């Protein structure tokens, strides 16, 4: 059904982290559809997504879970040991586990671990069961406008970008799918094209937006929000986002015109209905609410709130509806604004 006709992947089902970056110990269950991560800055939303993405990438034989994690977090001296949570109880060992329907992969490392030389658990079975998995991570900052020669500059050590930026450029450069667009794929592309006013073109390692019959525009000259929409167009067009793939999107609402937020919510729900497992982190009330408003009865949506308890430990709460989250900084801020607005009106 629909255009996303790839192999149905094995959705990720949970992540466990102990003494890893900001986490003392946490278990986060994932829904097989759209997972919306909320929480204030510094509670590890992006960390969880990067860790899950590293596990997805490790489904390929030539990618190691620990090395990918290191390249996504970019600690000093590429030392994974620097990702150990420096807590007061003296435990200097971190453990991480990512599970899917079919397999699991884990790693253990300590502050003394050299480079990314972590101990990996169950890697072979993970590679065997998950080898068909495609995953893509869209970072919060738009990068396609800087794609030209970025790989080379990073390799030479002239600039530092973590792997999420290099990976998204590589994914966007994939040769456009030669197949005629199916009705379902066309539906997505038309919606996105209307917003971004054009199609993406790649020439000499540089990205352009081509509006209809007009001359192509350098990505630098296109508003950043539109570049994000154009990137999504490209990933659907070239087949990177298909049934069974996993999409991680860090703050999709950043720099996007508020009038396009409902369309963005609708697209995420449409992709979820095509069996793409999605993780988005957001601070945006409108995106969170529009996902709620646009969902259908069949939509598989889970809200995940990360928050600090009284002791400062990061905890996790999940709910099937946005309003049901007890720890919800987005809602709290919205209510506060509403109360202040009422107060002004009553003066």
Report each predicted region and the residues it spans.
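Phosphate-coordinating catalytic segments in nucleotide- and nucleic-acid-processing enzymes
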Residues: 2-16, 55-247, 309-347
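Pre-Walker A-like glycine/lysine-rich segment at the N-terminus of P-loop NTPase domains
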Residues: 8-53
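Phosphate-binding P-loop
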Residues: 26-32, 239-242, 270
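Walker B catalytic acidic pair
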Residues: 250-252
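Conserved D-loop-proximal element of ABC-family nucleotide-binding domains
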Residues: 257-258
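Conserved hydrophobic alpha-helix in the ABC-type ATPase nucleotide-binding domain
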Residues: 263-264
């Amino acid at each position: 059904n629909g255009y996303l006709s790839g192999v149905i992947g094995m959705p990720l089902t949970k992540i466990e982290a102990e003494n890893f970056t900001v986490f003392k110990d946490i278990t986060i269950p994932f829904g097989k559809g759209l997972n919306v991560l909320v929480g204030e800055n510094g509670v590890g939303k992006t960390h969880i997504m990067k860790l899950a993405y590293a596990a997805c990438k490790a489904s390929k034989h030539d990618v190691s879970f620990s090395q990918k994690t290191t390249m996504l977090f970019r600690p000093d001296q590429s030392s994974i040991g620097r990702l150990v949570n420096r807590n007061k109880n003296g435990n200097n060992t971190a453990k991480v586990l990512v599970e899917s329907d079919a397999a699991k992969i884990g790693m253990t490392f300590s502050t003394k671990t050299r480079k990314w030389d972590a101990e990996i658990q169950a890697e072979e079975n993970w590679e065997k069961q998950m080898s068909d998995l495609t995953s893509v991570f869209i970072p919060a900052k738009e990068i396609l406008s800087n794609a030209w020669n970025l790989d080379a500059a990073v390799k030479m050590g002239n600039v530092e970008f973590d792997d999420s930026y290099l990976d998204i450029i590589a994914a966007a450069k994939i040769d456009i799918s030669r197949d005629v667009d199916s009705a379902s794929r066309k539906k997505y592309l038309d919606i996105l094209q209307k917003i971004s006013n054009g199609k993406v073109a790649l020439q000499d390692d540089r990205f352009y937006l081509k509006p209809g019959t007009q001359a192509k525009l350098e990505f630098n000259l296109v508003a950043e929000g539109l570049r994000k929409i154009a990137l999504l167009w490209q990933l659907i067009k070239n087949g990177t986002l298909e049934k069974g793939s996993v999409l991680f999107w860090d703050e999709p609402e950043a720099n996007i015109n508020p009038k396009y937020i409902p369309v963005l919510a609708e697209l995420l729900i449409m992709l979820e209905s095509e069996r793409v497992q999605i993780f988005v982190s957001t601070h945006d009330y409108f995106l969170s609410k529009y996902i709620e408003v646009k969902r259908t009865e069949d939509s598989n949506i889970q809200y995940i709130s990360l928050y600090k308890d009284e002791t400062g430990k990061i905890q996790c709460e999940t709910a099937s509806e946005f309003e049901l989250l007890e720890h919800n900084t987005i809602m709290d801020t919205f209510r506060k604004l509403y109360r202040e607005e009422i107060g002004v009106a009553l003066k």
